[in-house]
Amino acid sequence: MKIASNITELIGRTPLVRLNRIPLLEGCGAKIVVKLEGMNPAASVKDRIGINMINRAEQEGLIEPGKTLLIEPTSGNTGIALAMVAAAKGYQLILTMPETMSQERRAMLKAYGAKLELTPGSEGMGGCIRRAQELAESLPNAYMLQQFDNPANPQIHQQTTALEIWQDTDGAIDFLVAGVGTGGTITGVASVLKEKKPSFQAIAVEPQNSPVLSGGKPGPHKIQGIGAGFIPEVLDVNLIDEVIAVTDEEAIAYGRRLAREEGILSGISTGAALAAAIKVAKRPANKDKLIVMIQPSFGERYLSTPLFQDLE
């Protein structure tokens, strides 16, 4: 019988889908395909690191279901993934999250049974991380998973995401375009694919209003899920061939178009990735090349945000 023993066994093995109408209208010479991470059980790429960080901590004897209180700072999707895994395994979970994150994120976290503590939006992810550290130090039997520093984050992308992309493209991938939050996805995938195909290039996407990877200063922006305002420990910048900065307006516009012209409902960071992918696909040197862009999350948790507001 083909029956998963629990929900976490359904994480990964997400499909690729080719974009048709948008690249045609934009005059793209390269092919753009999307890795639909929104088809994971809790609807984001973070499901992968959620299960791997918890599994590794269990294997190392650091945490135990029913005894350990898990704590994590999150912009939303990692929190949702951890809440799903914690519910399935029997952990209590406290999440710290900037108050600027969407209402749907908050509702989903509570639906899974997680406790949520909001931090000032002006402090960004830095304030969120500091509060999580305070809780981890003050509460009994608490353990902080630390997605920004945890090697289990890029590891799962080396073991799963990279190989899925390689196999599903028959090794034909030329470019990966991925937004950088923790940097785990681009680090894990690029580290594997660069060994398999030396000509492969990894392109990082960041907010133009917080261009830290490009050497700029951190700042407030509307692209939830990327642009943490610092360079995370798990991000290997040496694997990045190019950084493309995207405006809030571009991310919103392309996120909307993806839903309306391709039928793919996604979050704002997917819109940012698409904006960058189109720039790469339009370059004459990239004619007939294959670009794989990551869809980090499904769009239902963004319906209250500027991405899907004021639609006609």
From Swiss-Prot:
Pathway stated in the Swiss-Prot or TrEMBL entry: Amino-acid biosynthesis; L-cysteine biosynthesis; L-cysteine from L-serine: step 2/2
Entry keywords, A to Z: Amino-acid biosynthesis, Cysteine biosynthesis, Pyridoxal phosphate, Transferase
Record carries keyword Nucleotide-binding: no
Reaction catalyzed: O-acetyl-L-serine + hydrogen sulfide = L-cysteine + acetate
PROSITE patterns per UniProt: CYS_SYNTHASE (PS00901)
Requisite cofactors: pyridoxal 5'-phosphate
GO molecular function, one term: L-cysteine desulfhydrase activity
GO biological process: cysteine biosynthetic process from serine
One Pfam family, short name: PALP
Signal peptide boundaries: none
Keyword GTP-binding: no
Residues involved in pyridoxal 5'-phosphate binding: N77, G181, T182, G183, G184, T185, S269
Top-level taxonomic group: Bacteria
Residues bearing the modification N6-(pyridoxal phosphate)lysine: K46
EC number: 2.5.1.47
This protein's GO CC annotations: cytoplasm
Family indicated by similarity: Belongs to the cysteine synthase/cystathionine beta-synthase family.
Name of the molecule in the record: Cysteine synthase
CDD domains cross-referenced by the UniProt entry: CBS_like
